[in-house]
Design a protein with these regions (language model features):
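Conserved beta-strand-loop-alpha-helix hinge in the C-terminal portion
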Residues: 216-234
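ABC family nucleotide-binding domain
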Residues: 3-205, 209-212
Length: 234
């Protein structure tokens, strides 16, 4: 197993009445350590199923899922809980912040359950919120709240950062700022970042582009010349 992340013939089925649907249909792909990867495809393509399996929030019915040399698909429920807690940071479309905690307290809350967390205030500073530590979510803009959620994920010091449509609830300008932050985080820390999106324009900023359709991997390509998100229009 030479790759940092690898799906090996992964299948996930759902039963709808008498119909069996393959949300993941023999998926094969890999991502190398430190890459900024974008997984792109239309709604219903299987992107979120893929993310849920890779993030340990769901299990596959067939195949193997590897992260850093370990077969996640063979983990027990207890091992999966440990995996989600320590190894993976999650950023979703909606921020899911605790409303009666400050920005700093939201990040500290996540850091407290981890083995080797980063300093919460320092990480908030890295995402441009050093002057907003004491603000509650209701006092922050959408972009600032998403930055808190990114800081919360990074403070766990995870091996892998998974982002599911992280700009979906943001306006164009703010969305670009958040994507720039994710790209910079990958470059500066060497952390592996995977972003799931339906927006094909964003693939220009990725080191690796994985296309998904109808539960299958259409392509897995390296982008030799990724560009800053500031240069991308959509």
């Amino acid at each position: 197993m030479d790759h940092f992340v690898e799906f090996e013939d992964v299948c996930k089925y759902y039963q709808t009445g008498s119909v069996k649907i393959a949300a993941a249909d023999h998926m094969n792909f890999y991502v190398d350590k430190g890459e900024f990867c974008i997984i792109v495809g239309p709604s219903g393509a299987g992107k979120t199923t893929l993310l849920n399996i890779l993030g340990g929030m769901d299990s596959c019915d067939e195949g193997h899922v590897w992260l850093d040399g370990r077969d996640v698909s063979r983990f027990s429920e207890k091992a999966l809980t440990t995996y989600r807690r320590y190894d993976v940071g999650f950023v979703f479309q909606f921020y899911n912040l605790v409303q009666n905690l400050t920005a700093l307290e939201n990040v500290e809350l996540a850091a407290q359950i981890c083995r080797d967390p980063l300093d919460a205030a320092e990480v908030l500073g890295q995402v441009g919120l050093s002057d907003r530590l004491s603000n509650f979510p209701s006092q922050l803009s959408g972009g600032e709240q998403q930055r808190v959620s990114i800081a919360r994920a990074l403070a766990k010091n995870p091996k892998l950062l998974l982002c599911d449509e992280p700009t979906g609830a943001l306006d164009y300008k703010t969305g670009k700022q958040v994507l720039a932050l994710l790209q910079r985080t990958c470059r500066e820390t060497g952390r592996t970042v995977i972003v799931i999106t339906h927006n094909t324009a964003l693939t220009a900023m990725a080191d690796r582009i994985i296309q998904v359709k109808s539960g299958q991997i259409l392509s897995n390509q390296v982008n030799e010349h990724p560009v800053p998100v500031e240069q991308i229009e959509w």
